[in-house]
Amino acid sequence: MNPENYLYLSALLFTIGAAGVLIRRNAIIVFMCIELMLNASNLAFVTFARMHGNLDGQVFAFFTMVVAAAEVVVGLAIIMTIFRSRRSASVDDANLLKN
């Protein structure tokens, strides 16, 4: 398969994720869209690494996955805290944690 196809797929996935972050108000959906954007960037890194014949993109994608795993833990903890206090998972309720 042509490497450009992987880059087009990566751009499409990133665009879908960015649109989801900007349009949706549910925190869990926004969180999933951010993860989709991270996976799209990983696909682009691995594709560029494959095109140039080195492993730098694959190593960077691995570290991105490690950071994404830590982000999942912290993000879900914050979403659960908002849901427990307000019974809603809307991102509009995030500023209510200040009190």
From Swiss-Prot:
EC number assigned by the record: 7.1.1.-
Q: What class of enzyme is it?
A: translocase
- Name the GO cellular-component terms: NADH dehydrogenase complex; plasma membrane
Q: Which BP terms from GO are recorded?
A: ATP synthesis coupled electron transport
The annotated topology with respect to the bilayer is: Multi-pass membrane protein
Q: Residue span of the signal peptide, if any?
A: none
Query: For this UniProt entry, which segments traverse the membrane?
Result: 3-23, 28-48, 59-79
Q: Where in the cell is it found?
A: Cell membrane
Entry's InterPro entries? NADH_UbQ_OxRdtase_chain4L/K, NUOK/Mnh_C1-like
One function term, GO molecular function aspect: NADH:ubiquinone reductase (non-electrogenic) activity
* Reaction(s) catalysed (UniProt annotation): a quinone + NADH + 5 H(+)(in) = a quinol + NAD(+) + 4 H(+)(out)
Recite the UniProt keywords alphabetically. Cell membrane, Membrane, NAD, Quinone, Translocase, Transmembrane, Transmembrane helix, Transport
Functional description taken from the UniProt entry: NDH-1 shuttles electrons from NADH, via FMN and iron-sulfur (Fe-S) centers, to quinones in the respiratory chain. The immediate electron acceptor for the enzyme in this species is believed to be a menaquinone. Couples the redox reaction to proton translocation (for every two electrons transferred, four hydrogen ions are translocated across the cytoplasmic membrane), and thus conserves the redox energy in a proton gradient.
Similarity section: Belongs to the complex I subunit 4L family.
PANTHER family, sorted: NADH DEHYDROGENASE SUBUNIT 4L-RELATED, NADH-UBIQUINONE OXIDOREDUCTASE SUBUNIT ND4L
Tell me how this protein assembles: NDH-1 is composed of 14 different subunits. Subunits NuoA, H, J, K, L, M, N constitute the membrane sector of the complex.
Q: Tell me the HAMAP family matching this sequence.
A: NDH1_NuoK
Q: What is the official name of this protein in its record?
A: NADH-quinone oxidoreductase subunit K
**Organism name:** Rhodococcus opacus (strain B4)
| Underlying gene | nuoK
